[in-house]
Amino acid sequence: MKFLVLLFNILCLFPILGADELVMSPIPTTDVQPKVTFDINSEVSSGPLYLNPVEMAGVKYLQLQRQPGVQVHKVVEGDIVIWENEEMPLYTCAIVTQNEVPYMAYVELLEDPDLIFFLKEGDQWAPIPEDQYLARLQQLRQQIHTESFFSLNLSFQHENYKYEMVSSFQHSIKMVVFTPKNGHICKMVYDKNIRIFKALYNEYVTSVIGFFRGLKLLLLNIFVIDDRGMIGNKYFQLLDDKYAPISVQGYVATIPKLKDFAEPYHPIILDISDIDYVNFYLGDATYHDPGFKIVPKTPQCITKVVDGNEVIYESSNPSVECVYKVTYYDKKNESMLRLDLNHSPPSYTSYYAKREGVWVTSTYIDLEEKIEELQDHRSTELDVMFMSDKDLNVVPLTNGNLEYFMVTPKPHRDIIIVFDGSEVLWYYEGLENHLVCTWIYVTEGAPRLVHLRVKDRIPQNTDIYMVKFGEYWVRISKTQYTQEIKKLIKKSKKKLPSIEEEDSDKHGGPPKGPEPPTGPGHSSSESKEHEDSKESKEPKEHGSPKETKEGEVTKKPGPAKEHKPSKIPVYTKRPEFPKKSKSPKRPESPKSPKRPVSPQRPVSPKSPKRPESLDIPKSPKRPESPKSPKRPVSPQRPVSPRRPESPKSPKSPKSPKSPKVPFDPKFKEKLYDSYLDKAAKTKETVTLPPVLPTDESFTHTPIGEPTAEQPDDIEPIEESVFIKETGILTEEVKTEDIHSETGEPEEPKRPDSPTKHSPKPTGTHPSMPKKRRRSDGLALSTTDLESEAGRILRDPTGKIVTMKRSKSFDDLTTVREKEHMGAEIRKIVVDDDGTEADDEDTHPSKEKHLSTVRRRRPRPKKSSKSSKPRKPDSAFVPSIIFIFLVSLIVGIL
């Protein structure tokens, strides 16, 4: 019986599990809301349904306002249906107007966040995609001229041409509404120097509501609109001196608390003739508001304003009414005061003027005239071409040889415009920015580059860079500005004439006349220096470097005048001039090992002892040298008038093989002699093996005979390299390893092997290891490579020598390419059934299969045509349950 009950429970489980798929509809209630149809042509401005005109980011909307509980299922325009849905009511709707005529619309359903967009074409409304709606909305915004993008500073609650401001008081709380005007777009909201909100690239601030107590911002509501026309709200509250975002519920609950809460303050008296700086904040005057601002520190509040013994203002109820800011205009002449109060609606502002030494009540019109008068006095202009220091501080500066000017306004002055002739570079736009500094770069007597620094009310600077192209100024980026600065600095540098250029054009001998040149301290006129520059000045500059290169004078070369008395009158050192051209060729002998044993080497004209001889002009081989300077040893050179203009004078200093490092001739003698000794000893100690017969492509050359492949004039080694390798050069003759390209050992070679200077032989010697070509290595199979133990090598007697295998460059290249080939072979394509696919790459043809080796063990191939699709695991669940039930019933029976 127990088994039957268990079976019954199992059978009843399946309908219960399937019940999850059923949708249980709620029981309809008897109180059904009526379906409402709304006509957008209705002129109703209040009630359960009406349209509220809204202007956001330059586009005008008609926003549908409905009371809770009203369900709108149809929106029409007269007899034309815009939207209709019998099942789901709308949540919100807005009509976009163009020239006061409906143009587009969007509808948002109650339970669907996706918007539905409509476009009016003629007399019909048709749905359109979101992209098309946004594109047309962007066209409407582009038709409106955008005058400025600005940041809203809530601490400056004054009228501005960029936004409208409406304020109202309730108890001690002041509510201010800021709305940007048409053409001006607000992107950021901040208070003093604290940033509160910054809109995204596709968002704009349409309105801001702030709640203040005095000048302290406590609560904030920011209205934001995006590209789709959707409005959102951002709420912020002052918590621990920081503006933290809060929810809409917190915002609504905080407003009554602010109105009912009366923050206690301490009454204080303000004496404008003697201000107590401890209890008040002081604000500077600006062009927009040219008044000196006085603000009491928290928690104090001004209840009485006096000027010495004269009382200007006194609160009637000090516990409730007070002044939270005083602005003082023009202390010297016809002063005026503006008091910002927290009471006495609707103005909340009082004005006072000083007439004939007595303070009297004034009006806002008088204050406006006073502000205009002060603005005219503060305003000044900046002409980048003619800078006046009357109202500006002009400081000339230099960067290298580049001249530029830093211009700042003097105290109580403001630059309102920067221009160049009739072209305006910058002008004052309003409260948000003012010019603090200007850098003007001048080239060739005219301004070329201008850098303007505009300071905003927040701690941030806006830099404007402009460059003059032709007759107009163009605004550039900071990177381009940096590049222009570098160009101007490079252009302004005074480039000194090159020494080589002077030497090539003006290379002469000693000065004319028997008188020695004057010393460094002797003053002479500029005309005399120009006359003697060709004969005396230029050789002096090159005399010092020549002495330094010869190793005889170690002092650094200085000005030309300092070398006049020390170089030019000394005629005994003039024969040293040609030594410089021959010194680079002395290392020719170490380059070739053949020449050290020549008996003519000690008397060769390239001998290191040559600098001591003064009979150089008598040498017969001297005129043959193409780089030999003949002019320095000519005794007629000092009196030759054409010698400085000779074009052949720069040959010796411009020799490309001239040593760049000073070199001592005595040191070269010692090193050269030591090299000869080492080479002679090497020749005597080395025992050469018998020369075996070679093939036709290799010809042996005796040591003493020159070869056709080895030229007589071998390129010399530079002295700098020769000096660097002084400790290694003598050992390289003994330890120089001459091997084949395979890196295998070879028989001893003579030091002057002609293989250095002759082309490589095409054949191989029996005693040399056979080097296979790279193509032969690639043709070997994998089995041949693995079974090869080494290569065949024969010694000088012809006996085969078995050596261990070492990987040469060819072997590494061959193995790498074999591995790459094997990787291509192992590429197997598998189909859905797990078998190899029948493609040509996986199963190559007969010819292709013979040339490659499959590294993978073969397995039986299954035909892809006969394969059946596998059943999913869920298909076996009914079979398993059926088997389980059958077995259970059988067990019970």
UniProtKB/Swiss-Prot annotation:
Organism, as annotated: Theileria annulata
Organism superkingdom: Eukaryota
Propeptide: 874-893
Record localization: Cell membrane
Signal sequence, renumbered to the chain: 1-19
Region (Disordered) location: 492-666, 681-799, 818-873
GO cellular component: plasma membrane; side of membrane
Keywords carried by this UniProt record: Cell membrane, Glycoprotein, GPI-anchor, Lipoprotein, Membrane, Repeat, Signal, Sporozoite
Record Pfam families: FAINT
Topology relative to the membrane: Lipid-anchor; GPI-anchor
Lipidation (GPI-anchor amidated aspartate): 873
Primary location: membrane
Comp. bias (Basic residues): 851-869
Protein name: 104 kDa microneme/rhoptry antigen
Record's compositionally biased regions (Basic and acidic residues): 525-565, 573-591, 731-755, 788-797, 818-830
Residue stretches of biased makeup (Low complexity): 595-606
Compositionally biased intervals (Acidic residues): 831-841
